[in-house]
A protein has these predicted regions:
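Non-catalytic terminal/accessory segments
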Residues: 1-197
């Protein structure tokens, strides 16, 4: 029987609901024999619903190591057919946590810092997130990465008064991205800016 474990979290793969309930019962007995017990809220049987498994079940998603596993719409690379597969992507909780972290940077207030210094500061962190959470369904991170561009936009408009109009800022941003396409790690995936008037 396959399983993954990290610290006190584990995912056990079962073929049928009956098998899952038997494993649950056996684990409960084992844990109790050493004075422990399974977490009542976190211990669940999850139905990995997809195009081939279409039954109705109470729980069809779970979170593990910052990823949410759930049914997702997919497209066949062979013939373009749309189907449902059970796949991981960055979890909403992890996204919220990273967004909070970026807000705490208060990047737009660091106007004594230049672009190169900003990039040197945030790139190792953002690249780490991209490498870890972007392994599967990385598009789920795009709106979050665009938010980093929003903070960069605010930083530039505060630092350079001439960039406070949309037209001038757009020319500056597009020129910067054309000259230095790899300046910020997340530009490998998302280069557009968001303008807030």
């Amino acid at each position: 029987m396959e399983f993954e474990r990290f610290a006190d979290d584990a995912v056990v793969h079962c073929v049928t609901e009956r098998q899952a309930r038997e494993v649950w019962a056996a684990l409960s007995v084992r844990m109790e024999s050493v004075g422990l017990r399974l977490h009542p809220d976190k211990t669940k049987i999850i139905y990995c619903k997809d195009s081939n498994r279409r039954a109705e079940f109470a729980d069809t998603s779970f979170t593990f190591l910052g990823y949410m596993f759930r049914p997702r719409e997919s497209k066949s690379s062979r013939n373009g057919t749309i189907f449902t597969s059970f796949q991981p992507a960055i979890s909403p909780v992890a996204l919220k946590d990273k967004s909070r972290q970026v807000r705490r940077w208060r990047m737009h207030r660091k106007t004594t810092t230049n672009l190169e210094e900003l990039a040197e500061w945030i790139n190792p962190i953002v690249r780490g997130w991209m490498n870890y959470y972007g392994e599967f369904n990385r598009f789920e991170m795009y709106s979050f990465l665009r938010r980093i561009n929003t903070y960069l936009t605010r930083w530039a408009r505060k630092k350079f008064k001439r960039l406070r109009t949309y037209r001038r800022f757009k020319v500056w941003w597009e020129g910067l991205v054309a000259r230095e396409p790899a300046m910020f790690a997340h530009w490998a995936w998302v280069r557009v800016f968001s303008w807030i008037g």
